[in-house]
């Protein structure tokens, strides 16, 4: 984000100290940064260029009782039409999205793309993340949600996580302290700054072949008719969300201008003129029907702001 050239509004100066005004803007649209491409604006949107600024933003939000959210790649976020009445911190600057190899470890900024991290580590002959290639989202979101694929979750290779905790204190947690479980962790409510992964040296050629095979497979399953997509549900322990939705006859179900893909129903598609309200209604209908027919309570992968 470029510095704001005009004088800051009274609202900005009321909520944020002077040394943050150049990284915060008011009433900013979010839809351009979200995969679904719908929803209203953020009351305040900040794009910090230094880690210290994130700490100061967090402190300002706490002091002014502003709701706060962190935005990475926007692949699992749905914003309602009314927008988000609070502060959104977008992690897009190099200081928050870098990738650095240190021996057999990867130090990744929370805003870095997960797939970029996979490609970098595979190229360095380091195994442990290659099975996650093609999964959308940022490192921070992937770790908070303990994303998994091929029977292995990302938490299994996390050595440490640098965070700002719920009290605004910067600290480093071990992987064990993050409370990793099936598609969850105890990191929700914190701001993840960076993650260190402990990986295993492996043959570059073998890793590359495995990564390419998985990438092609996932690309073939992704809906081709639309780029405005999201995966709204977490796979239950015993069955994938795709299989579960197919088994209940809900593939292709539609609510206004929003639908589940007919071939890969774990994908939600926002067609032209789609709204966030339609997304919420469709998700609710699917969860209700799946619960009635199978007894399984589908949990949300999508964050609704």
From Swiss-Prot:
Active site annotation, chain numbering: 183
Top-rank taxon: Bacteria
Keyword Ribonucleoprotein found: no
Pathway in which the depicted protein is active: Cell wall biogenesis; peptidoglycan biosynthesis
Keyword Cell wall biogenesis/degradation assigned: yes
Entry keyword set: Cell cycle, Cell division, Cell shape, Cell wall biogenesis/degradation, Cytoplasm, FAD, Flavoprotein, NADP, Oxidoreductase, Peptidoglycan synthesis
Protein name in the entry: UDP-N-acetylenolpyruvoylglucosamine reductase
